[in-house]
């Protein structure tokens, strides 16, 4: 990588750091409104990174070099690492929170990757500025995820994401990285914000206080899962709140390009026609029905309560949101394991969810069906079709390799945690929560991830970033072939 491209990467990263420093202003306003000391912490963070980012951006502004695909991979990884560190900074320097660096980093990574796992035992005791800040991390991270999924990964050809690029409208079709980022970010910000506002209004109408509604609204549409209470959604003990949370978890797992088309063209036909969405909703319905039957069958709730609690928690875990009912840790172990497995499914590509994504599972299902048909008729000329489009060998190889790497890293992290002395259920649940960006632990991590040792926390930070970036952008940087001219 020559000097000129180091300058262009530094220029872009400097701009992103400068821009992200502005995100410290809203929590400063909240701290000022509630007369909290955290105002000074956010102000210090703002000044430091405003200067660092602005300086790096300004001193490299005359680079005049066009971004390459290789630069795109580097910037993607740097984007999430830098944002994670900046997000952790105010949590780390505030002496009243008494968080170690790794605890602050874990919280920052969890927030910006929309994982929602926390190391804080008593979330309810946090100052309001921090409660808002954590939800804001989810919201900003969610937008970054959507831009990454819709504008960048298809262009880079990662994990079959390019399959739906030809279906994208207007600003989503451009093959130039810089223009895609600018135009797509602007378009998606509007769509994303509208869904967030709708969620806040629905929470408020369901009886949630305004501050809680704002925080939960922006963390729900980002599928981040940070809450203002240690008991999460269970704190409110309100069926309407759970229905709102479950519904918006599902809606936020839709491909956001579809939401853009629906809003711009004022028609829901794209939602009805989309095969990935239909497959996702079919899977969601199955998970909800199975979960409802299991908790009703053992007599935890009546039929009505079983459906509502199951609808909420199944929707939350399937879409990797991570909001929870107060007593979910007391649910049958086999039910929780079933929901943890469903978290690997995730939602649609182009959404804020984590996991492997429904489109990839649909492609793998179609490929398996194709192999059975080909074995039955060896001489037949058959192809794999998804949504009326032929899946190319390039896309198929990408999906299979992504599935293999995702499984490999999951097994690796589980074995490492298990080797550290954590029981298998805790290890599996912790890794599922982190690599799927779902955030809900079980076993020893059911109430907080603070019980993990420091090495385990660092590993789970890596797992969260790997899951969020869909593996390839991270591991490609360790390839010698990548760095060759």
Short names for language-model regions:
Residues 1-485:
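Membrane-proximal intracellular helices of multi-pass ion channels
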């Amino acid at each position: 990588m020559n000097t000129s491209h180091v300058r262009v990467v530094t220029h872009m990263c400097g701009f992103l750091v400068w821009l992200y420093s502005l995100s410290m202003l809203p929590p400063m306003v909240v701290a000022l409104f509630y007369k909290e000391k955290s105002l000074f912490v956010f102000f210090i963070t703002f000044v430091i990174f405003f200067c660092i980012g602005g300086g790096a951006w300004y001193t490299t502004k005359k680079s005049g070099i066009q971004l390459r695909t290789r630069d795109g991979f580097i910037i993607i990884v740097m984007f999430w690492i830098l944002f994670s560190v900046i997000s952790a900074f105010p949590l780390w320097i505030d002496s009243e929170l008494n968080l170690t660096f790794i605890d602050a980093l874990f919280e920052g990574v969890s927030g910006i990757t929309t994982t929602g796992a926390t190391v804080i035992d008593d979330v309810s005791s946090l100052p309001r500025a921090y409660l808002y800040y954590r939800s804001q991390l989810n919201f900003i991270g969610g937008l970054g995820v959507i831009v990454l999924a819709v504008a960048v990964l298809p262009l880079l050809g990662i994990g079959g994401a390019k399959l739906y690029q030809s279906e994208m409208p207007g600003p989503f079709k451009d093959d130039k990285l810089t223009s895609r980022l600018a135009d797509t970010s602007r378009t998606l910000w509007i769509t994303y914000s509208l869904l967030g506002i709708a969620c806040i209004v629905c929470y408020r109408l369901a009886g949630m206080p305004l501050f809680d509604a704002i925080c939960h609204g922006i963390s729900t549409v980002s599928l981040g899962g940070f809450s203002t209470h240690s008991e999460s959604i269970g704190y409110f003990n309100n069926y309407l709140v759970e229905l709102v949370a479950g519904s918006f978890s599902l809606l936020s797992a839709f491909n956001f390009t579809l939401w853009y088309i629906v809003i711009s063209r004022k028609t829901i036909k794209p939602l009805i026609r989309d095969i990935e969405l239909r497959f996702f909703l079919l899977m969601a319905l199955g998970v909800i029905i199975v979960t409802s039957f299991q908790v009703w069958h053992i007599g935890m709730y009546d039929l009505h309560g079983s459906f509502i609690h199951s609808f909420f928690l199944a929707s939350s875990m399937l879409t990797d949101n991570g909001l929870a009912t107060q007593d979910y840790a007391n649910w049958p172990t086999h039910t929780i394991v079933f929901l943890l497995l469903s978290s690997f499914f995730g939602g649609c590509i182009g959404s804020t969810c984590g996991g492997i994504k429904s489109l990839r599972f649909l492609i793998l299902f179609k490929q398996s069906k194709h192999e059975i048909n080909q074995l039955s008729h060896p001489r037949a000329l058959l192809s794999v079709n998804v949504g009326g489009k032929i899946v190319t060998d390039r896309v198929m190889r990408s999906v299979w390799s992504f599935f293999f790497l995702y499984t490999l890293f999951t097994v690796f992290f589980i074995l490492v945690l298990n080797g550290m002395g954590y029981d298998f259920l805790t290890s599996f649940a912790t890794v599922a929560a982190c690599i799927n960006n779902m955030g809900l632990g079980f076993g020893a991590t059911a109430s907080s991830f603070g019980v993990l040792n420091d090495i385990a926390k660092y590993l789970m930070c890596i797992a969260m970033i790997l899951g969020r970036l869909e593996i390839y952008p991270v591991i490609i940087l360790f390839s010698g072939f990548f760095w060759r001219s």
